[in-house]
């Protein structure tokens, strides 16, 4: 057992290193986008902490998979220190406690801390009242989120878990036995239901932003941006044209006659357009003379290579997701069981790759980290291109060094929910890996064969799957926690199809769109001239 404990400690040590790397990444990421003029300590700490907690939770997934895989030898037998079911349960409970803690913190962030900080700054902007009144109003609005959280916990604690279906009773027994491993605690069910509800919202965010970002980001890297010099020449022509239109309207009142309401309205619009064009000219002049713009020309081939790599990775994900969903559609136990699969019938590339990588520790750790970071960057690309919307109303724009505290909190909330959904996405891409890792078991063949001694049964080494004997394979806590309620799994299944459709639509749209402006997102009609100081000084 001492040897096993030492080796298991390696997995947790790497988790600790990842934790530090995650904190550093979140700090750099948030500081990159926050407005330096409107920077607030509380909003910055809240954004960094909430995003870090989500990423740390996702980092538990490879630890969980490593632990269940490490308990078994390559020949399908349990290692000496893991032969006791009690020992295996204790090891897995350490992961479960980790999930308990981190998911509880996520609920606290989503339903209390982030809403409170958001409404506090909204009150700070809208009113000139005292700080006490701002805090009181923020708590008043936050109480609605606390009520929603309480309802989710109550529903989760008492929601029926029985699977009603006319499928084969043997399959039903296997499904029920899987989830009995996690226990029947009402507290655990309540937490699982609440987190699954948030993961459902994360699925909608992933369909909206990540699916589009997976196609937009690589194609933007491949196509590049327009030339700053030629773009500035076009902008100068537009400025001259608008100035001529303004002069024509102003010439009507040279003799002292007042302008008509129609002319006044047209003059106002032209002056606003002229103001925006002049701001664009200042930004284009800066980019035209900027050293970084010249460096981008040199590294352009590398951007094209990265773009090609990203689009290949995106296609790999989509193909794997399609094959996994198709496998569920053809061979699963049905919608009433959450489309659980008994064995892998249609093998996808990622489901084959991850168990192989796990044999050389920590390659699977690195690969899972790359997948999570890929989802983060593509989600960010989608959010930057689209902005944060509520139905048809755009709430906030996300721009480097110019994002307001409220928008930053919204951004980190969306990314937190998307990262929560990442665990299920990885399961969809590699179901066998997420459920059992690289575990194998010995299957006793019922047929007998004659030997010199007599008749004997043959043992076959098989990969663990949902049809394996209960005492031969250990299911990860991640899978059981996120799939305790079968109806969420069914919704996730249809969400995966929606994800594929949105990706294809986004790919077509991105291919049809031309090159982006070199100052894309830097200048908007509703920006003030003072906002230029966020980007760079024009002295």
From Swiss-Prot:
Q: Which residues lie on this side of the membrane: Extracellular?
A: 1-7, 69-98, 164-186, 325-362, 428-484
The way this protein sits in the membrane is described as:
Multi-pass membrane protein
Alphabetized, the UniProt keywords read: Cell membrane, Cobalamin, Cobalt, Endoplasmic reticulum, Glycoprotein, Lysosome, Membrane, Transmembrane, Transmembrane helix, Transport
Q: Name one GO molecular function term.
A: cobalamin binding
Disulfide-bonded cysteines: none
Cytoplasmic-side stretches of the chain, per the record, are: 29-47, 120-142, 208-303, 384-406, 506-539
Question: A Pfam family in this protein?
Answer: LMBR1
Instruction: Report the locations given in the UniProt record.
Output: Endoplasmic reticulum membrane; Lysosome membrane; Cell membrane
Q: Does the keyword Protease apply?
A: no
Q: Which InterPro entries match?
A: LMBD1_LysCbl_Transport, LMBR1-like_membr_prot
The record's Gene Ontology biological-process terms are:
insulin receptor internalization; protein localization to lysosome
According to the UniProt record, one GO cellular component term is: endoplasmic reticulum membrane
Residues bearing carbohydrate? 75, 85, 168, 345, 445-446, 455
Per the UniProt record, which residue ranges are transmembrane? 8-28, 48-68, 99-119, 143-163, 187-207, 304-324, 363-383, 407-427, 485-505
The family this protein is said to belong to: Belongs to the LIMR family. LMBRD1 subfamily.
What is the documented function of this protein? Answer: Lysosomal membrane chaperone required to export cobalamin (vitamin B12) from the lysosome to the cytosol, allowing its conversion to cofactors. Targets ABCD4 transporter from the endoplasmic reticulum to the lysosome. Then forms a complex with lysosomal ABCD4 and cytoplasmic MMACHC to transport cobalamin across the lysosomal membrane. May play a role in mediating and regulating the internalization of the insulin receptor.
Query: Protein name, please?
Result: Lysosomal cobalamin transport escort protein LMBD1
The species this protein was found in: Xenopus tropicalis (Western clawed frog)
Question: What gene makes this protein?
Answer: lmbrd1
């Amino acid at each position: 057992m001492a040897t096993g404990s030492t080796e298991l400690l390696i997995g947790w040590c790497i988790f600790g290193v990842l934790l530090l790397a995650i904190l550093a990444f979140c700090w750099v990421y948030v500081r990159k986008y926050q407005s330096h003029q409107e920077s607030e300590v509380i909003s910055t700490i809240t954004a960094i902490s909430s995003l870090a907690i989500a990423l740390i939770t996702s980092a538990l997934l490879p630890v969980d998979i490593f632990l269940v895989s490490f308990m078994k030898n390559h020949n399908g037998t349990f290692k000496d220190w893991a032969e006791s079911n009690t020992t295996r349960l204790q090891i897995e409970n350490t992961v479960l406690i980790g999930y308990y803690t981190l998911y509880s913190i996520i609920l606290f962030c989503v339903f209390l801390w982030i809403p409170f900080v958001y409404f506090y700054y909204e009150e700070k902007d809208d009113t000139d009242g005292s700080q006490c009144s701002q805090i009181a109003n923020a708590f008043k609005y936050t109480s609605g989120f606390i009520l929603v959280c309480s309802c989710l916990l109550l529903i989760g604690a008492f929601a029926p878990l029985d699977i009603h279906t006319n499928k084969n009773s043997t399959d039903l027994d296997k499904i029920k036995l899987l989830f009995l491993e996690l226990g029947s605690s009402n507290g655990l069910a309540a937490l699982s239901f609440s987190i699954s509800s948030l993961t459902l919202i994360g699925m909608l965010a992933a369909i909206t932003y990540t699916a589009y970002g997976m196609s937009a980001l690589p194609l933007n890297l491949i196509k590049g941006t327009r030339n700053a010099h030629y773009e500035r020449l076009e902008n100068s022509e537009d400025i001259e044209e608008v100035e001529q239109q303004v002069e024509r309207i102003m010439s009507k009142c040279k003799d002292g006659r007042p302008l008509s309401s129609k002319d006044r309205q047209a003059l106002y619009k032209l002056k606003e357009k002229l103001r925006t064009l002049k701001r664009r000219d200042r930004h284009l002049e800066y980019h035209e003379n900027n050293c970084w713009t010249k460096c981008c020309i040199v590294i352009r081939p590398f951007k094209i290579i990265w773009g090609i790599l990203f689009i290949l990775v995106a296609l790999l994900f989509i193909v794997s997701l399609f094959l996994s969903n198709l496998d569920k559609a053809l061979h699963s136990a049905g919608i009433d069981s959450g489309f659980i699969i008994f064995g892998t019938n249609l093998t996808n590339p990622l489901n084959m790759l991850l168990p192989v990588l796990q044999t050389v520790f920590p390659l699977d750790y690195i690969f899972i980290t790359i997948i999570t970071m890929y989802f983060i960057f593509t989600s960010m690309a989608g959010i930057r291109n689209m902005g944060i919307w509520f139905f048809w109303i755009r709430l906030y724009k996300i721009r480097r060094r110019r994002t307001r505290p409220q928008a930053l909190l919204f951004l980190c909330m969306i990314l937190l929910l998307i990262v929560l959904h990442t665990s299920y996405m990885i399961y969809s891409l590699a179901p066998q890996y997420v459920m059992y890792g690289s575990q194998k078991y010995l299957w006793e063949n019922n047929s007998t064969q004659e030997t010199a001694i007599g008749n004997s049964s043959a043992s076959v080494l098989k990969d663990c799957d949902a049809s394996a004997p209960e005492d031969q394979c250990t299911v990860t806590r991640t899978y059981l926690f996120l799939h305790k309620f079968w109806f969420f799994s069914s919704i996730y299944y249809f969400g995966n199809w929606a994800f594929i459709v949105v990706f294809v639509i986004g790919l077509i749209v991105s291919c049809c769109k031309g090159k982006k402006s070199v100052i894309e997102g830097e200048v908007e009609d509703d920006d003030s001239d003072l906002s230029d100081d966020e980007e760079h000084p024009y002295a």
